[in-house]
Amino acid sequence: DILEIDRINRYGEKGGMPATCWNCKTPKMVQWIKQYGDDFWAKDFNQFRTEVTDDDSIGCATCHNAETMQLQLYSEPLKDYLKSVGKDPAKLPRSEMRSLVCAQCHVEYYFNDPGHGPTKRPVFPWKNGFTPEAIYSVYEDNGNVDMPGFKGKFADWVHPVSQTPMLKMQHPDYETWIDGPHGAAGVACADCHMPYQREEGKKMSSHWWTSPLRDPELRACRQCHADKTAAYLRGRIEYTQDKTYK
């Protein structure tokens, strides 16, 4: 979809957005980072438009080693975070990887301002924790020191009418999960959204990435909540979701 939206200019030579926007859209990121290093991020998005085909979208290589099919991470900002907390991305247990492959993209992030590292390199703002308050505290002192009236504080964009610097919270799914009851219980993202199934006698993860509610029997939920009916679980989930949305 990123090739078809008008937020990124698809009608001219310049896209008007940094190449960072490719980070969660194609595993070709591995190739580009090897080729350009940190110079890649601040390049124009449209410079790479012709290098991507339909086969280069999110796929097997986003989460798997192409030779062994073991889970692996390609996301530079996620690997940066893991290294900062003393974890080797290549030596993590499978139970943790079944959520971290999702955390490559389903997260809050920001693009580095000059003076805080490679320009436009994506960063996951987790150094103080995963709560909204912890994430906001990172934005208090990682911004453009030259921005009038907002010196030192980070802003994703400036409102064109009021000229007010703004934050744009993306999609903090991993952060919501890890601080929620399922994350605390050690339930992985894939346990609910890619539950195990059997095909021709083999156990494998479903690759229909969707809500467990799409299954009338709620089999993903009942792997753990075996004493509850599908109707009860559906009602409980919808009650919680409705309360949250309101």
Give names to the regions the model predicted.
Residues K25-T26, N65:
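Short loop/turn segments at strand-loop or loop-helix junctions that form parts
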Residues C24-K25, R198:
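Low-complexity, Gly/Pro
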